[in-house]
């Protein structure tokens, strides 16, 4: 049977590692008494469009907690330069078909709506020429636009397909007229978008990605998706169908989630 006739399977992978510079041991920190990684895995389990899901980790303590809770775990190398490299190892270990789709669910975003996971997967299915898909949302305030921790994205529309042109920590696009005036409007451009860290990949892209060295812009911006663009790949992008709640990067973020009632947290 040709690959064109074979069914496309969708796999959700949750990369989880302990080495966080801002919040050590992040996947194992608890929200309402349960390790964060388990909240994320339970959310992924609600995504009924996927054929399967697993947690990818290089840490035995994370693996044990997830295995004890009944989740599939894949042990991966601790030497990966990026999360995408880790996904590629999982795809190789699992023997997934080149035309299959992998959805990357961040291990520090326990409130991700399954709707967005399905949206990013569908986006990739609908754009046969793209090797990745991701989402974005409008930036409404100037401080967010200027913040380096917020990744911005500019895109183009070609043949009714919207694709990313560039991702940056810098404030892009730049409003030339505002920059050249003495009075800054303190308003982001109307077409300023924040990139959301949800990705869908074709396994064929993951197979190629690991053989490509880190690229100059990827290293400069510390954004792994730039490796795809610098090697000529297309990344489909769309405005998120709903808002993506903030993930957990700091102790304040963790405290905010623990301050929510358990019912509100579970029903989010």
From Swiss-Prot:
Keywords noted in UniProt = Cytoplasm, Lipopolysaccharide biosynthesis, Nucleotidyltransferase, Transferase
State whether keyword Transmembrane helix applies: no
Q: Which gene encodes it?
A: kdsB
Q: What's this protein's name?
A: 3-deoxy-manno-octulosonate cytidylyltransferase
Q: What does the UniProt record say this protein does?
A: Activates KDO (a required 8-carbon sugar) for incorporation into bacterial lipopolysaccharide in Gram-negative bacteria.
Tell me the Gene3D superfamilies matching this sequence: Spore Coat Polysaccharide Biosynthesis Protein SpsA, Chain A
Q: Which GO terms describe its biological process?
A: CMP-keto-3-deoxy-D-manno-octulosonic acid biosynthetic process; lipopolysaccharide biosynthetic process
- UniProt record similarity statement: Belongs to the KdsB family.
Q: Which organism is it from?
A: Psychrobacter cryohalolentis (strain ATCC BAA-1226 / DSM 17306 / VKM B-2378 / K5)
